[in-house]
Each structure stands twice: as structure tokens, then as C-alpha cells.
Amino acid sequence: MRYSFIYKVMGLCYNYFTKHTQRIVNYNIFIKIVLMKVKRMTDVFSIQDFKFPTNFLWGSAVAGHQVEGNNIHSNNWYNEQQTLKVNPNYEVSGMACNHYNMYREDVLLLKELGHRAFRLSIEWARIEPEEGRFSQTELDHYIRELAFLKENGIQTFVTMVHFSVPLWFAKKGDFSNLENIKYFERFLNYVVPKISRYVDFWNVLNEFNLGSTQQKLDFKFNSVFFHARGYHIIKQYSDKPISSAHALVQYYGRRQNDVFDVTMQHYNDIINHEFFFHAMRTGELVLPHKDGVFDKELKNTVDFWSINLYTRDIVDARKKDFRGERYDFTKTRMLPMNFYLDEFYPECVYHNLNRLLDKPVYITENGCSCYDDDFRIVYLAEYLSAMNEAIKSGVDLRGYLYWSFLDNYEWSTYIPKFGLVEVDYENSFKRTPKPSAYFYKEIIENNGFSQKILKKYLKNMPRVDTSLPIII
């Protein structure tokens, strides 16, 4: 049962309640009371069967620093070690999933599970560990991995920078300093021509678009130019489609009848999303506290929309960072920690993709972090259903990459479990596909959702385990 339907009947229910009980109740309180009694998730057993378009591309995604291990020359590795010095309990990436040494096993498992595409990143810190010193040995490693993916019939999405960068580059100010674009150009000119024959889709950068502080606004402003320059360099060596992965969060005013919350809802959308879409379509870059810029080099520097989307963020205009508390009655506790992705909100798929009707769309990240794998199956059913609705409304959605193929290092902890495949860190990094991996495999084989597939893997709707201790 989705809230959009509930709200339509709320007025009738409220009128009936007040008439027959002769009690006057605040309408917003009434809504909250009712919604707390509603299931937090759709009854997925009521979803009708549906198919995806022919040649729809199915797969999964990872990021180098989160799965490879021993990324010792990166800024992330350095920051982890510095944090560990002051907090002995801090979890560092370490060996991560040991994907660097186990990529052949992982590729064969991808093939076994039916994946036809795989998104991975090139770790710049491995390729250029010191300024101006390039490692052909490390580049050869990525060439072997990409070649092995292609040999096994798996299309590749390659991200040139997925957050982590060489420590020396970070010390120079990374993407916050436009003067550093020459180092990025040099890196791309070294790597791209050597790997281009193995790449089907390119992501220049990953998720540089979020944040509202002045520092983040400056970072985003400059990153658009890094993206555009990367696009033009890659085009010199490859005719495959290019984009940058965009974190498309739906912003939602906490009080929808409050002019301040709704205004800041739209403001957050502009500074985190529309600024990029507008720049790609027109060449005009507009962000607060910066003079607008028109640069023809920016225009049309995406061949497709590469979209990472998970849920919504609540906006509260009365908070200095505009971050509102999520509604308690929509949270789904699936981990022994407070986690920002504790709400299922598939509406964000339909809402967000319908603003991207001018180019093909690939969802390059979407996933659920949970200990009870049944939640992941429900999540997939809900979000795939929303994708189907978006396609029916005219969105040219051509592919879906689940995040993540493996349980991995989530930047500061191993507690979140996004993976279709479990990794036993205490037992030689043994890989064990979860039931959701086989559910997803049958979705891929069927090129669509069916109740027959669902009922094979899900017997009942999962319930929140309130006994899970909060570790952090």
C-alpha cells in the first residue's frame, strides 16, 4: 500500500472520524496515527507481472576502493589510517573484499548469476601512486580484468574516479582546484587509449553533485569542468557512450503545507541536481554564490543519464543544514546501526526519471542494505515495479545495475550489507550468493517480474527485527 493512495482517502476518513466520535483532532496528527498502523512496504504479492523492453541490460556495480583492498596510495586509505590513530575501534578498508586478487572468481560468479553488465572503477592511486610516475603493471591488471569480463560476455561500465584519488592529488586540492585539471587530463590520456577497446560505457566521475556548504558548492562547480574535459578526452579514443554517475536524491519538504520547507525542497533540488542537468543541456552553469558561466565545452557532454538513486531526503528549512529527520513511521530497521537508507521509497524512481526524457537512462546504482535478505527481495520487487511504471510513462530506461554485487566496505564500516553475494572475511573471503542473487538471476532470465518468481524466493513479507542491537 503506497502513501499516495492513502492520502487520497485521508480526508474522507478524517471527516468520518470526527463526525462519529464527536472529537476534533489535528489533521496532521490524525494522518501520523493512521500511517503508523500501515505497513511500511508494499504488499509485493499484489504486484502484477510485467516485462522490460527487449535488450534491457541487467547487471551490478562495485567501486575499487570498496572491494579491491590495499589501495594504499589513495586519500581514503590515508584518512582511514589517520582516523584509526585516534579511534582504535574504527574500521579501515584493509583487504576489503580482496577483489583485486579474486576478480576472475568474481567475473565467473557474475556470469553464473546471469549478469550481463558490470560497473567497476579504475583506481587512479594505483595507476599514478606518485605525481608523474605511472605504473604499467597496475594498468595491465585492469586490462586483464576488463578483457576477462568481455571474454565472458559481460558489458563494462568503467568509472574513472569513484571518490578515491591519489593522496598527492588530494593534497593539491583535488577537484576543488581548477588548476588541477592538467593532472586529470594526463591521467586520462595515459589510461583511456589503453583500455578503450574493453569499455562499453564510461563514467568520468561518480556522484560529485551532492552538498550545500560553500565548500561543496565550489567543489561541484569545478567538477562540472573536470567532467566535461574528461568527456572530450575520452571521445578522442572511444565512440562508446559517456556520462558521469549522478546521485539523484528526491528532496521532500518535511511539512508539505509549509512554504519554507517546500521552498528549500526546490532549492536543494536545484543546487544538487538541476544545476548539472541544465549545464549538460545548455552549457550554462549556475550555482549559488558563484557568477553564472556559459561554456560551450559543457554542453551535451553526456550521451546518457547515469543515475544512482535509492530514496528521498527530508528537508527541514528550520535546520541550518536543511536536513530533516525522517518520519519514524516510514523507517524500516534492517541493520544494527542508524543508517540513512532505512526507508523504502520507490516513488523516487518514477518521480526522478520522468525529468530525464531527453536521453537514454541507465540506473548505475540502486540497492538495499539489510541483514534479512528477504528485505532485499521486497526492495527489488518494489523498485523494479517503479521502473516499469517509469518506462510506461515514456522514460527511455535501458539498463539497471544493482548496488552492490558484493557485501563491501561502506567507506567507514563493514556493517551495511548491500551485496547480492556475501563475503566471509574470516574465511579466505569466500563468496556465497544470497537468495536475492538467485531471485535477481531469474528476473534477468525472464527480463521481467512475475509472481511465480517472487513466491519461489519469498514466502512472507519480512518483519522488522526490533531486537537488533544498535552497534553504532
Regions found by a protein language model. Give the residues of each.
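Short, positively charged and aromatic/hydrophobic N-terminal segments
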Residues: 14, 25-32, 37
